[in-house]
From Swiss-Prot:
One Pfam family named in its UniProt record: Ribosomal_L14
Biological role: Binds to 23S rRNA. Forms part of two intersubunit bridges in the 70S ribosome.
Gene Ontology process terms (BP): translation
Cross-referenced NCBIfam families: rplN_bact
Family in the record: Belongs to the universal ribosomal protein uL14 family.
GO cellular component, as recorded: cytosolic large ribosomal subunit
GO MF annotation terms: large ribosomal subunit rRNA binding; structural constituent of ribosome
Domain of life: Bacteria
Name recorded for this polypeptide: Large ribosomal subunit protein uL14
Family matches, as InterPro entries: Ribosomal_uL14, Ribosomal_uL14_bac-type, Ribosomal_uL14_sf
Amino acid sequence: MIQQETFLNVADNSGAKRIQCIRVLGTNRRYAHVGDVIVATVKDAMPNMGVKKSDIVKAVVVRTKHTMRRETGNAIRFDDNAAVIINDDKNPRGTRVFGPVARELRERSFTKIVSLAPEVI
């Protein structure tokens, strides 16, 4: 579960390393889960890349430490909280995605992120 002030790792090569959640997009929502879009600020970035420190970006959550129940009865959780930075068209700003992503992203129409990911769990 991601809420305001939560730090997340960035799982793409857009230039940002860590982001901090400012707001969970949706109607008066408090927590974000896998597949939800958040507004975040870049806290740590690599130099000479597309994203700079203190930029305001939109990102989609791809991994959470909080256990997620699936309809089949399986439970899944990841080792870290991670997100992929996206543009207004819901396409990733980077060209690569690092680490596994959850299958729920395909149901939420983030197929470009799923196709770039090395592993879908």
